[in-house]
Amino acid sequence: MAAEKQIPGGGSGGGGSGSGGGGGGSGGGRSAGGDENKENERPSAGSKANKEFGDSLSLEILQIIKESQQQHGLRHGDFQRYRGYCSRRQRRLRKTLNFKMGNRHKFTGKKVTEELLTDNRYLLLVLMDAERAWSYAMQLKQEANTEPRKRFHLLSRLRKAVKHAEELERLCESNRVDAKTKLEAQAYTAYLSGMLRFEHQEWKSAIEAFNKCKTIYEKLASAFTEEQAVLYNQRVEEISPNIRYCAYNIGDQSAINELMQMRLRSGGTEGLLAEKLEALITQTRAKQAATMSEVEWRGRTVPVKIDKVRIFLLGLADNEAAIVQAESEETKERLFESMLSECRDALQAVREELKPDQKQRDYALDGESGKVSNLQYLHSYLTYIKLSTAIRRNENMAKGLHRALLQQQPEDDSKRSPRPQDLIRLYDIILQNLVELLQLPGLEEDRTFQKEISLKTLVFKAYRCFFIAQSYVLVKKWSEALVLYDRVLKYANEVSSHGGASKNSLKDLPDVQELITQVRSEKCSLQAAAILDANDSHQTDTSSQVKDNTPLVERFESFCLDPSLVTKQANLVHFPPGFQPIPCKPLFFDLALNHVAFPPLEDKLEQKTKSGLTGYIKGIFGFRS
């Protein structure tokens, strides 16, 4: 029997064959498939020892499945592709081991027994059975959102995966298998069992299985080097949200905070637990919303009777804290979008309640028309939250673009580098949002609010004007840029003079003093660049006679250095030659014709008249001469 290269630690051959096999399976090429079979048949140094039971069998279970999953579809969540890979790899292993299930016409079931454990590929065969069933279950889980009936099939495939994992664990209990493989098999079985109990919502059994899996992987991680422990620690991090979710459903109310932190760290949208986690957080906020009856904003308290608005306002502080603690810009942007989406939903709910309230206001007394209703004031508050969040998001994007602009990396053809025009557009949107804030109903008489918004408007106008000046510098319009820099200093000085009494409103805004320092340095650089550009333009004017595209044949009398004459594009003569004017052909007029005398024709006319009728008749009968 042909032996295969062993996988790491006595069993790397299975992992290697899987990666190579996946390439052939996905590519579909004949040569790739031949390479896979050759890899399965490659002999290993320890195969004879395994046959004689002198060495222990070893299989890096977690490493094999992680590498196979990343290389064959799971990086993009394509479980169907991974299931196809598992089937193809199973078929190759059975063919290599001569362990076929009958022939084309008849199926003969065979099970891997302890007596067959002469090669670690028999363990790999059972592992691929479990992985194939698990990947099919995960594929059905994705489809079960639109087709609930598929959930029954999902549970069936998970049970089958657990059955194969238990068979793998039973085989690994043999004395021929080393201790590390035994522990990995136990952890793998516990993980799949926990997944099955989790889907059945048997929270206590699920948390016991997940804790067992976590304990084994933590022990394995502490027993090996840091490089080998990375995979085990990653698996522990994957299991932790499931454990906390089960703990919450058992009755641990403190688990909800840890789940929200896990959602923040993971990005919130990845993993099969994401939907249940979002539903759990919404459900928890809904329970807390029952105790919330009013909200206070800018000295006025308004009742909150709409459940959707209550849920949004309760989660507002958590969302803002999550944005502050976000580690990456992608996570921060996603949280901003999520918060804006929730705010829009809350605003829509208030608008639906405002429609009948607006009809009642039409019949209200004129004396009461000066004060907006509580519902309208609540709408203004939610609009303020939405616009303020949009301003913060655009300001955060502008800071990122500004950092990229200052780095001045070389331009890449595949990725467009940021330009000052991009920042100008963002600050235009911010200023538009500030104008909308000034027009909110119920805040017309709030002088403090109006002053704060006016101050913020000056700050963002200064930054917008600064980047407009930067765009003029790029096209070497020095005078326009200098005027705009002066305008920036004017705005910044106004903010500094009026911002002393409103320091609280400026604490979240960009530093104006830093902008003033930067503008002053930019003005010095601009003036120096303008002087250099003037000298360059003067030199260009003096040398412009060389580059007037006059051919050499027309300027023999003047000497000038023209480097283009020694190139293949030398301008020597006009070719094709240009057209030159020539005299036209003269015109001749026959003026002598008027003075020519022609002979008389009277005698001929008389002869023709004499013939008359007789001549005509003779002509008919053919007697005319």
Curated annotation (Swiss-Prot):
The modification N6-acetyllysine is found at residue 451. GO terms for biological process: response to xenobiotic stimulus; SRP-dependent cotranslational protein targeting to membrane. Residues 586-608 are annotated as: Required for interaction with SRP72. Disulfide bonds: none annotated. Residues 8-32 have a biased composition (Gly residues). Residues 1-52 are annotated as: Disordered. The modification Phosphoserine is found at residues 47, 240. Its main location: cytoplasm. GO terms for cellular component: cytosol; endoplasmic reticulum; focal adhesion; nucleolus; signal recognition particle, endoplasmic reticulum targeting. Residues 33-42 have a biased composition (Basic and acidic residues). It is found in: Cytoplasm; Nucleus, Nucleolus; Endoplasmic reticulum. GO terms for molecular function: 7S RNA binding; endoplasmic reticulum signal peptide binding; protein domain specific binding; ribosome binding; signal recognition particle binding. Belongs to the SRP68 family. Component of the signal recognition particle (SRP) complex, a ribonucleoprotein complex that mediates the cotranslational targeting of secretory and membrane proteins to the endoplasmic reticulum (ER). The SRP complex interacts with the signal sequence in nascent secretory and membrane proteins and directs them to the membrane of the ER. The SRP complex targets the ribosome-nascent chain complex to the SRP receptor (SR), which is anchored in the ER, where SR compaction and GTPase rearrangement drive cotranslational protein translocation into the ER. Heterodimer with SRP72. SRP68/SRP72 heterodimer formation is stabilized by the presence of 7SL RNA. Component of a signal recognition particle (SRP) complex that consists of a 7SL RNA molecule of 300 nucleotides and six protein subunits: SRP72, SRP68, SRP54, SRP19, SRP14 and SRP9. Within the SRP complex, interacts (via C-terminus) with SRP72 (via N-terminus). The N-terminus is required for RNA-binding. This is Signal recognition particle subunit SRP68.
